[in-house]
Amino acid sequence: MISHVLVKDTSCLKVRTSYKCFVKYFPKCSVQSSFHSYDELAFSRRLYNLPRTLLNSRYYSNHSHGLVHGSKSPPSSQFLVPSFLQFNGQLKALCNNSAFQALPIKLSDLQKHWPSLKPHPLPPKRVSLGIPSISNPPVDTVISDSPTSPHPPSFVQPHPPYGIFAAPILDVRVLTNPGAVKRTYNLCLDISKYPLLEGKDWKIGGSFGIMPPNSDAEVLHLAHLLKIPQHELYVTKVLRTNGGRWPTIWGEDKPRCLYTSLYHIFKWCSDFISKPPTKSLIRLLAEHTLNPVEKSVLLALSDFRQDESYCRICTQSCVTLPDILEAFPSCHPPVDHLISALPQLMPRWYSISNDPSLANKRLEMAFTVQEYHSPNGQSRTGICTGFLEDLALAFLKARHDGSLANKKFTVPMFRGVQQNPFAKEFHNDGPMCLIGAGVGIAPFRGFVQRRLANAACTGKVWIIQGCRDQKLDELYHGEWNTVPGHHKNPKCRAKKLVVESRNGRREYVQDAVRRHGDVIWDVLSHKNGRIYLCGSGNSFVSEIEKALMDVAMKYGKLSKEEAQKELKNWQKPMNCKLIKEVW
């Protein structure tokens, strides 16, 4: 019995409208479909209006042995698409779906795995949702859904015993000028009522956590894609977990029974936007996809050996769960199993940009809005920076309108352990050089304030600040030699160099390090001299380290091997001459 028929030459198919999408994605592939007789093949040819060449093909595969009639093995260029003719309409619909077209998925990349898929195993189901057995389930009074003062459920515990504190916003400043590539803001928060434990304080150079929510628009959009009625989002459910820390973040590892709603789970506990879907999650989506073609593509994406298309999903187009659901509309995963497979929505950490000991219970922080584009080209912002910008703009608007006194603006934040490198290794003596790019310069503002206010300080301070254009995005311009509300030590002055990458010299901070290598070497050679480095990306750090090695070779007369060894010594805890914070 003939079970599969192969078409050797697909060039004749290109004239058929129904096969344009197939030829587009499989230009060198043959077609295979399931038939039980020659008559069935002929009927299907007439039904689908296929060329007669299909009937004349001499290439038949044997279902039981996987061989092609007339040869020992199929041509290497052939790709077997299971039951293609049966699913021709579904394939065309998938390829014509604009959401699918926007994804960086090439069906030709999947061809080598399709005949023998090894999909990722299904993720375990750790969560169940039910209806409360009591008529009046307890209400979490901590929750606030106010757009300007949002607060998560009480079970969200990013750092026990510290709860999440609603810190009032006292002031907002825009640090960049119109025309800057990125927007950067400075927030001033009131921490006078923060419940600090005995013996704890806020450290200069420290960082604190912010618990951002997913936006209501994103939550409602996800619910729409999952076919969840909007009113169902707000119905109180019994959430049971079989172990782990979720949804508390860092609470005790144990089973839980909580009263909550899908709205609060999606808003505060599940990260479905900032990270690409894992293969485990894609496998779950494939399991609950009705359309056979969509199911096959998702299964192929979850294959252990599939790297090309999946890597593009992770690195090129910022693909999210909603993007996948839009591209594969027949996918309807169970909500409880989906929640089990989604990562926890985690807090974001921000450096303190002032000296807390001089600020009268006020913390300042700077943030740059992270922007990227969705697969279809729409602009998106990072979960936390987008959330903070919305708060900042609403605050500025209320202040402009004169309605600030009637509104409450708060940020959900918590102290954390204050054990980041800058908090542990700030020293108030000896010369220091502060090197930062972009918003990485923010924690050094507090360093300089501490030095300027210290009457006994005689150590010199050098600042190398990297930006694109000094006129547009130099942060804290004119603030580096002042201490608000305090007298400045006249003997101490910070010397600052602004490095522009798109104007002036068009150089980067590592170029300035080499150009001022004599100053850098003087700092490193001093007994108490230290260099602090802050920025984003490992490439930033590696370039600075290369520049420091060049300085050591030029001014310290060291060989390359000796400079490499010295670079490692500077970073050892016992020496602590090069302190880095990178994100």
From Swiss-Prot:
GO CC, alphabetical: cytosol; mitochondrion
Main location class: mitochondrion
Domain FAD-binding FR-type: start-end pairs: 162-424
Xref: InterPro entries: CysJ-like_FAD-binding, FAD-bd_FR_type, Flavoprot_Pyr_Nucl_cyt_Rdtase, FNR_nucleotide-bd, NADPH_Cyt_P450_Rdtase_alpha, OxRdtase_FAD/NAD-bd, Riboflavin_synthase-like_b-brl
GO terms classed as biological process: homocysteine metabolic process; methionine biosynthetic process
Obligatory cofactor(s): FAD
Keywords attached to this entry: FAD, Flavoprotein, Mitochondrion, Oxidoreductase
Alphabetized PANTHER family for the sequence: METHIONINE SYNTHASE REDUCTASE, NITRIC OXIDE SYNTHASE-RELATED
Molecular function GO labels: [methionine synthase] reductase (NADPH) activity; flavin adenine dinucleotide binding; FMN binding
Protein name according to UniProt: Uncharacterized FAD-binding protein C1783.01
Keyword Cell division (UniProt): no
Record's subcellular location: Mitochondrion
Similarity field: Belongs to the flavoprotein pyridine nucleotide cytochrome reductase family.
Organism: Schizosaccharomyces pombe (strain 972 / ATCC 24843) (Fission yeast)
